[in-house]
Amino acid sequence: MMMHQLRSRPTRFVALVALAAGALFLAAGGSEGACPPAGARYVVSGGSALVAVDPPPGQPKNDKGGSAMFGGTVARNMVNLTDKNIPGKFEPEDKEVLLWKADLGSKAYGGPTVAGGRIYVGTNNQRPRNDRDIHRTKDGMVEPLDKGVLMCFDEKTGKFLWQAVHDKLESGRVNDWPEEGVCATPTVEGDRVYYVSNRCTVMCLDANGFADGNQGFQGEKYKEKTDADVVWQYDMMKELNVFPHNMSAGCPLIVGDILFVHTANGVDDGHLNLPSPNAPSFIALDKKTGKLLWKNSLPGKNIMHGQWSNPTYAEIDGVKQVIFPGGDGWVYSFVPETGELIWKFDGNPKDSVYELGGTGTRSDYIGTPVIYDNKIYIGLGQDPEHSTGISHFFCIAPKKDKKGDISGVLEVKTKGADGKDVIGEKPNPNSCVVWHFGGEEARKFALRDFKFGRTMSTACIVDDILYISELAGQIHCMNAKTGEHYWKYDTKASIWGSAYFVDGKVYLATDSGDLFVFKHEKTPAKIDELEGITATELKEARKQIKARQKEVADKYLIAKIELDAPIRSTAHVTNGVLYVMTEKTLYAFKGKK
């Protein structure tokens, strides 16, 4: 396959060691019959009832008081329909626009989450807030100790309030990569802050810190006024034998009294062995106590690499369900109270193959499922170290009368002339696929041989218009109902975050430190860079393609704003303020009066 090279900075949160040559094919099930609750382990306690938290059938609603989780709501749609007068074209240091900025560590991926007058972000300790977290060398030099850190700031002023500081795992980079810090975006409900630490521990903190005394757990390592007050913690490595690959990065989902999270179970440093194939990938905890309610060991031995996606909740066609993307390329739906499997969906072609280093055609998920109009939207991707490659984006609509495998196709095996198995496909009568975008691009003069590349991003859907970005730098604008493709734009830098809609604009940040702002239209123009090309030679064709690309930029690009460092998070707006988190700085921007 022709590989489209990423134009990005070299650092990565899941940096890989040298890989052995060869390929590893991991196939997941694909029978036509209904699936039993494979891998389910029921540890259900009484009194843990779900309350109705149903996303609306169309437009999502946002909490004016503050977005409390990744994606804003349980639907995980990156859309804000409330705030207005959000700056779209500005200079970062313009005092009329810059409300405040706060120093972080040297890496920051988790957040920001804004709730209750506070802002929470995950980072590292490369710019320490406490002298105890440094090392003084014999010659008097000061070096920061490597730690994972969750920081809390005041929403209005950016004043530092407190932080949770986590030691690194003793096992090292295979489970806890150096200097990556806390990668999870926190979830906040009331005065409780939930996240997964770099130590693969689910944390519940008191949002007030120690200002209201020591709540819950009493054994905190640090208890100064700027330290975090731990209410409870659940160590997934100790309790469940989970083996996180390089980093734990789950953003918890809360529905009623239940907290859902990925465990990050994955392969070892050799990338061929799965140390804990029977450990759960998906769990549910009591949000008040941290008690395990249920666990599920899917995908089990079929995990290809790591697992860094997030769960989503929805009631679709009358069925309440929690939806987990798996590290085998399948999406799984479970009964929220028990963990019983409802359905599963394979996003890869049946003849796809996972290969070490990302040269294969089979992928898993880093982006989070989005619920819109009773449908699920998700794209496939891989560790960013694997670069880009052929991928797929799906819209699926599960039905209450369809259980088990709802993939678009089923696997068919035949014998080739050499006697070896040949993998093929046939239509799945139980399919719930509405539309699919991606696969091979065979049109003449195409700049690459696939339509859609691997993505780490979560979709943004508003007015039936969908925005989804790729790791390689492209953002696509499509019809959410039909999958019709309107236009795409190449930012020329890798994208780790997601598109975010607010105030008629779409914000998208890149690894080069740029914040792109696009104009949203309810009826976008269809500008296909390859359609209608009249050239017969490549040189002339490229000129025509560039003209189409310029047409997209002229019509939709509002601004390209340069910030101080790579941005590997999603822009966010709460209470009229635009928050942008680079690797080392949290910015708060306001609209001009």
For each feature predicted by the language model, list its residue ranges.
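N-terminal secretory signal peptides that target proteins for export/translocation
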Residues: 1-10
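Structural motif marking the loop-to-transmembrane transition
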Residues: 10-11, 186
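Bacterial N-terminal signal peptides
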Residues: 14-27
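Noncatalytic, solvent-exposed loop/strand surfaces
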Residues: 30-593
